[in-house]
């Protein structure tokens, strides 16, 4: 894309997150040809928009989706294994990560097919099993359904420990991989 513009030194990719009017996070992805001046101006512009900026390399999933997608998938695996219900996993994830929306609520909001497409894309591009989409996510999409998160959100201490350890584990594992790759 940068070369097609005829001004490759002034080209930078931006990755906004859902919902861009509310989510303050943005990834800035310089091309190999991007000048430092261009990157600096784009970062400054994004900060003027009130965004929290992550500058990263042009790699599959950039930074955030590299750990966010397996985080969603790990939640699906926890459900598939019968560790807890979707509502309980969401509640435990919200507490552990101090966030307002759990993995199943988020997938319902953005659409489960987006989560599956992301897992399949990253699994193919990175050839890493942690990105292979969970079967229950595939089944949900086949049924053209959404996750049922209407149930009881109360979880046991044991459930919370398993959920939080598994979700943090996948995030930390991928974060280490990202650092190692220099993304």
Residue ranges and their predicted role:
Residues 1-183:
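N-terminal glycine-rich phosphate-binding loop for ADP-containing cofactors
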């Amino acid at each position: 894309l940068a070369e097609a513009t005829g001004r490759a030194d002034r080209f930078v990719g931006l990755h906004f997150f859902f919902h861009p009017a509310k989510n303050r996070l943005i990834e800035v992805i310089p091309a190999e040809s991007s000048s430092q001046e261009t990157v600096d101006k784009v970062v400054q512009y994004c900060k003027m928009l009130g965004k929290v900026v992550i500058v990263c390399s042009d790699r599959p999933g950039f930074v955030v989706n590299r750990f966010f997608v397996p985080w969603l998938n790990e939640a699906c695996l926890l459900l598939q294994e019968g560790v807890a219900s979707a509502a309980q996993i969401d509640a435990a994830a919200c507490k552990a990560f101090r966030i307002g929306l759990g993995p199943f609520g988020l997938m319902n909001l953005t659409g489960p097919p987006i989560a599956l497409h992301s897992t399949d894309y990253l699994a193919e591009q990175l050839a890493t099993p942690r990105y292979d989409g969970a079967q229950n996510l595939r089944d949900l999409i086949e049924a053209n359904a959404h996750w049922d998160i209407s149930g009881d959100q109360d979880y046991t201490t044991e459930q919370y420990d398993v959920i939080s350890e598994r979700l943090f584990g996948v995030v930390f594992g991928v974060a280490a991989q990202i650092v190692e790759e220099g993304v």
